[in-house]
Structure formats: structure tokens, C-alpha cells
């Protein structure tokens, strides 16, 4: 069990409040899950106004598998089928088929192109004809109950956007070390300190949603 803690970023309610403030201002946050689950930290940004610079940061510092987290109704609005009919992944991560914006991109792989695709698919009035498949952005379908139904980064991302009063669409990518290994909590905290990102956990979001009376004013 790691002795490193995110308590330096406040108590659970304070950590969520600080993450909300960052997201409302268009900045990113780092979301960690349980050490006994994936034991990873995802860098998250609001999807609706994501910039090429933010996508470039995800490509440079993270795994490169940039995912767009959406609730079920938005996935259905876009007409996106699941990547597989029988999901046998360890944590039931609900990938749909990958996507590309139908217009405004070239090869689709650059940071600018991926930002265009994300903004296109995240638009409240987005339609199936606005996107093509396959592509270089990977949508994820959150469960309807959010983190109260599944303790995943996908659900945490969508819940955070809703708590922030934003459209329920967020981008995530797993933070990695320079050597390509997955960043664990000590490296995640160091990265957060260096770049000024708030850190919170999926359990923080569950506590925030379950005990709204304890939200700070």
C-alpha cells in the first residue's frame, strides 16, 4: 500500500470544488482511481472548448489514447455502436467505434485535428453525419448512474462536467512516465505540482454526490 496521499490537495469536498473551479475556467484536472483498481491518473479537460494545445499536452505527457467520455444519451444521439458486442475487458471499459470529424480535419491525427473532432462530437446538436469512423478519437460510454454505478474514470469525467455545470462531455488520457510506464500516485502528484493541476479521486466524486449537504458554500 502506497503511503503517498492526495490529502495535500484538501479534503474530498474541497478537492472536488477545486476541480470544478478549474474545469469551469477551461483548465484540466487529474483524476485518480483506487490503488487496487487501475491505479492510474487521468488528465481530464472539458470537451466542448478543448484546444489544440491541450490535446498536444495529452499526446506528449499521456498514453496518446485520447478518449471522449459521454453519457448514454449522447452516444445514442451520435449513433455510435460499441466497439465489441461482448465486452471481456477487465473493467468493462465501454469503448465505441473510433471517430473523426466529417469536416475541418486532414489526416485526423494532429492535435488540432483531434481537438476539432472532439469539439464536433461534443456539440449539443451533433448528429451522426457530423462524424466519420474509424478515426483517432475514442469515445467511451459512461453508465447512467455515473460513479455511483461504476467507479471508473469515464463516469468520473462525465460526473465532473455535470457538477461543473458544463455539457456532459469530457476528454481523458492516462498520464504516463517518460519511459512509457504508467504514472502512479507519486508521479501524478509531482506532475500536478509542476503544472498546477488539481488532483482528486473517483471516491471524492462519489462522496460529493452522496453528501451534497457537505458541499462548501
UniProtKB/Swiss-Prot annotation:
Domain of life of the source: Bacteria
GO biological process: riboflavin biosynthetic process
Keywords of the record: Lyase, Magnesium, Manganese, Metal-binding, Riboflavin biosynthesis
Pathway involvement of the protein, from the record: Cofactor biosynthesis; riboflavin biosynthesis; 2-hydroxy-3-oxobutyl phosphate from D-ribulose 5-phosphate: step 1/1
Catalytic activity: D-ribulose 5-phosphate = (2S)-2-hydroxy-3-oxobutyl phosphate + formate + H(+)
UniProt-annotated binding residues for D-ribulose 5-phosphate: 37-38, 42, 150-154, 174
Binding site for Mg(2+) 1: 38
A GO molecular-function annotation: manganese ion binding
EC number: 4.1.99.12
Record's cofactor remark: Binds 2 divalent metal cations per subunit. Magnesium or manganese.
Keyword Secreted: no
Keyword Metal-binding assigned: yes
A Pfam family per the record: DHBP_synthase
Cofactor(s) needed for function: Mg(2+); Mn(2+)
Record's GO cellular component terms: cytosol
Gene3D superfamilies from the UniProt entry: DHBP synthase
Record field: transmembrane: none
Subunit structure: Homodimer.
Stored PANTHER family: 3,4-DIHYDROXY-2-BUTANONE 4-PHOSPHATE SYNTHASE, GTP CYCLOHYDROLASE II-RELATED
Function field: Catalyzes the conversion of D-ribulose 5-phosphate to formate and 3,4-dihydroxy-2-butanone 4-phosphate.
The name this protein goes by in its record: 3,4-dihydroxy-2-butanone 4-phosphate synthase
Organism: Desulforapulum autotrophicum (strain ATCC 43914 / DSM 3382 / VKM B-1955 / HRM2) (Desulfobacterium autotrophicum)
Gene from which the chain derives: ribB
